[in-house]
């Protein structure tokens, strides 16, 4: 009494696609995908994180909405400059990996960055070589006239 079902010639019932409801704004225009503030500003650094840190840090009672965007852009520019100089230093020394020492050399050899990071210590950055300055004044050579005039004949 075991009955087997005959093989049907129809393929298995395909799942019906879900009906997509278009996103529409209040005015009836189609909404675009949500975009991050970093993407809207065209920068890589996270604007939302900078905003959160500004608000949690209590640097000011109020933070304008454009302040974290500007600060993130400035931070991204500084990091780009430092990494570019460190890359140049790294390629001069024929290395493929940027180390803290390369960053320290890059910052130390650039006048503007050196003045900005004057009181900053980079961990494992090493020490920059500086020219030795003599503590005393240079000795003057006695002039010929002074040497001739000082000799006494007895």
UniProtKB/Swiss-Prot annotation:
Keywords: Chromosome, DNA damage, DNA repair, DNA-binding, Nucleosome core, Nucleus, Phosphoprotein. It comes from the Eukaryota. Residues 1-15 have a biased composition (Low complexity). The modification Phosphoserine is found at residue 151. GO terms for molecular function: DNA binding; protein heterodimerization activity; structural constituent of chromatin. Pfam families: Histone (PF00125), Histone_H2A_C (PF16211). One of its GO terms (biological process) is DNA repair. The keyword Nucleus applies. Disulfide bonds: none annotated. A motif ([ST]-Q motif) lies at residues 151-152. GO terms for cellular component: nucleosome; nucleus. Phosphorylated at Ser-151 to form H2AS128ph (gamma-H2AX) in response to DNA double-strand breaks (DSBs) generated by exogenous genotoxic agents and by stalled replication forks. Phosphorylation is dependent on the DNA damage checkpoint kinase atr1 and/or possibly dnapkcs, spreads on either side of a detected DSB site and may mark the surrounding chromatin for recruitment of proteins required for DNA damage signaling and repair. Gamma-H2AX is removed from the DNA prior to the strand invasion-primer extension step of the repair process and subsequently dephosphorylated. SMART domains: H2A (SM00414). Residues 26-38 have a biased composition (Basic and acidic residues). It is found in: Nucleus; Chromosome. Residues 1-41, 128-154 are annotated as: Disordered. The nucleosome is a histone octamer containing two molecules each of H2A, H2B, H3 and H4 assembled in one H3-H4 heterotetramer and two H2A-H2B heterodimers. The octamer wraps approximately 147 bp of DNA. The [ST]-Q motif constitutes a recognition sequence for kinases from the PI3/PI4-kinase family. Core component of nucleosome which plays a central role in DNA double strand break (DSB) repair. Nucleosomes wrap and compact DNA into chromatin, limiting DNA accessibility to the cellular machineries which require DNA as a template. Histones thereby play a central role in transcription regulation, DNA repair, DNA replication and chromosomal stability. DNA accessibility is regulated via a complex set of post-translational modifications of histones, also called histone code, and nucleosome remodeling. Belongs to the histone H2A family. This is Histone H2AX. The lineage of its organism: Eukaryota, Amoebozoa, Evosea, Eumycetozoa, Dictyostelia.
């Amino acid at each position: 009494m075991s009955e087997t079902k005959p093989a049907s010639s129809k393929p298995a019932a395909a799942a019906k696609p879900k009906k997509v409801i278009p996103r529409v704004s209040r005015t009836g225009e189609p909404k675009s995908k949500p975009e991050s503030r970093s993407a809207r500003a065209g920068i890589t650094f996270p604007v939302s994180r900078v905003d959160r840190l500004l608000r949690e840090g209590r640097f000011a009672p109020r933070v304008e909405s454009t302040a974290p965007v500007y600060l993130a852009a400035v931070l991204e520019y500084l990091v780009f400059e430092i990494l570019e100089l460190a890359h140049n230093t790294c390629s001069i020394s024929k290395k493929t990996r940027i180390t803290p020492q390369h960053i320290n050399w890059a910052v130390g050899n650039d006048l503007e960055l050196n003045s900005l990071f004057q009181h900053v210590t980079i961990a494992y950055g090493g020490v920059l070589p500086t020219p030795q300055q003599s503590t005393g004044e240079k000795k003057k050579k006695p002039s010929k006239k002074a040497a001739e005039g000082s000799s006494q004949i007895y």
